[in-house]
Amino acid sequence: MHRRHVLAAAPVLLSLPAWAHHGWSSFDQARPIYLEGTARDVRWRNPHAELKLELPADAKLPADLATRSLPPQSAPVDGAALLRAAQLPTRKDRVWDVELAPLSRMGAWQVPEIRNGDRVAVLGFTFAAEKGDAILRAEYVFLGGRAYGLRSSPV
């Protein structure tokens, strides 16, 4: 009888880490953050690609950021408004953990595989009031002069 309970509970228990990992409600989606730097410790794998982004000491917003062209995607994302509202983080961490999209979505966008040492820029969201770890959930990634939407598939 005990074994049957364990087997019945296993799927629920095994799904808890995935549920906790993908709960984005604590990210402040009203305050887009722009980061640009050098990719380190790139992990190109599922459930989603991740990297550490090493920022320069003199980080600044690019002058053309608000006017950059963004590709359409299937989710209703007001990318132009996000670009206009983008700001640098107030915290002074020089290294941020950046969470990208699942590999299937990265493939749909034809995002080139990011490698250690690549120059990368991202626009995304961190925790409310920038509390907790320096983690950014990327909404857009900018590579090689191109922008890629990460919330949904390209249209």
Question: Where do the model's predicted regions map?
Answer:
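Structural detector for short beta-strands of small beta-barrel domains
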Residues: 32-45
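N-terminal signal peptide c-region/cleavage motif recognized by signal peptidases
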Residues: 15-17
